[in-house]
Amino acid sequence: MDSNTVSSFQVDCFLWHVRKRFADQELGDAPFLDRLRRDQKSLRGRGSTLGLDIETATRAGKQIVERILEEESDEALKMTIASVPASRYLTDMTLEEMSRDWFMLMPKQKVAGSLCIRMDQAIMDKNIILKANFSVISDRLETLILLRAFTEEGAIVGEISPLPSLPGHTDEDVKNAIGVLIGGLEWNDNTVRVSETLQRFAWRSSNEDGRPPLPPKQKRKMARTIESEV
């Protein structure tokens, strides 16, 4: 096993522990707590994949961080912080919408890279909007936290979420996954639109009908993909 993979996991475990202690003091805001929950799932998945104990890794990560801090001057820390672009956390969904359980009458699931796409194929002839919570850096989507598809009545009928065991994805991965979800929902004569915020930062554009600028060939490909897997 690569040593960098192990040490990265150890540091992530310790930093999560620090953030959890911060949250336990009721100091974290909603985006902070949301990321904390999802990072916990990710760490569990990585720990299982690597065969590493989280508690042991946390202790090792503490030693690594302490060693770095001992060598770090205040001036170097200021320069490092100034050189890193700041990311922003954007929310289409409330915490209730993100944490709500939902069920599928005709479940369909597809994995695209490090993203899991789920949808209810029993949904037909509905107006659906895609909402997402995600981080943005340099005016481009950086990390998808969660995307869900809602009917006008507020029911959840689809979802795109990162796989805890496969962290890391690009904005192109997210756009491709959205294309798959749209293709699957439209196959049953649903009308799908994407939130203006998501259009703006994923595609850097927006359409009045809420449709992202998917090329016709890509849309046909997405529809065929869903059809072949039914």
From Swiss-Prot:
A GO term from the CC aspect: host cell cytoplasm
Region (CPSF4-binding): 180-215
Residue ranges of the motif Nuclear localization signal: 34-38
Leader sequence segment: none
Processing and modification events after translation: Upon interferon induction, ISGylated via host HERC5; this results in the impairment of NS1 interaction with RNA targets due to its inability to form homodimers and to interact with host EIF2AK2/PKR.
Positions of the UniProt region annotated as PABPN1-binding: 223-230
Lineage top rank: taxon: Viruses
Stretches for region RNA-binding and homodimerization: 1-73
Alphabetical UniProt keywords: Eukaryotic host gene expression shutoff by virus, Host cytoplasm, Host gene expression shutoff by virus, Host mRNA suppression by virus, Host nucleus, Host-virus interaction, Inhibition of host innate immune response by virus, Inhibition of host interferon signaling pathway by virus, Inhibition of host PKR by virus, Inhibition of host pre-mRNA processing by virus, Inhibition of host RIG-I by virus, Inhibition of host RLR pathway by virus, Interferon antiviral system evasion, RNA-binding, Ubl conjugation, Viral immunoevasion
Swiss-Prot/TrEMBL GO biological process terms: symbiont-mediated suppression of host cytoplasmic pattern recognition receptor signaling pathway via inhibition of RIG-I activity; symbiont-mediated suppression of host gene expression; symbiont-mediated suppression of host mRNA processing; symbiont-mediated suppression of host PKR/eIFalpha signaling; symbiont-mediated suppression of host type I interferon-mediated signaling pathway
Motif (Nuclear export signal): 137-146
Stretch list, region Disordered: 205-230
InterPro entries reported for this sequence: NS1, NS1A, NS1A_effect_dom-like_sf, uS15_NS1_RNA-bd_sf
GO molecular function: protein serine/threonine kinase inhibitor activity; RNA binding
Gene3D superfamilies noted in UniProt: Influenza virus non-structural protein, effector domain (3.30.420.330), S15/NS1, RNA-binding (1.10.287.10)
Location(s), subcellular: Host nucleus; Host cytoplasm
Function: Inhibits post-transcriptional processing of cellular pre-mRNA, by binding and inhibiting two cellular proteins that are required for the 3'-end processing of cellular pre-mRNAs: the 30 kDa cleavage and polyadenylation specificity factor/CPSF4 and the poly(A)-binding protein 2/PABPN1. In turn, unprocessed 3' end pre-mRNAs accumulate in the host nucleus and are no longer exported to the cytoplasm. Cellular protein synthesis is thereby shut off very early after virus infection.
Family, per entry: Belongs to the influenza A viruses NS1 family.
Domain notes: The dsRNA-binding region is required for suppression of RNA silencing.
Subunit structure: Homodimer. Interacts with host TRIM25 (via coiled coil); this interaction specifically inhibits TRIM25 multimerization and TRIM25-mediated RIGI CARD ubiquitination. Interacts with human EIF2AK2/PKR, CPSF4, IVNS1ABP and PABPN1.
UniProt-recorded name of the protein: Non-structural protein 1
Species of origin: Influenza A virus (strain A/Chicken/Scotland/1959 H5N1)
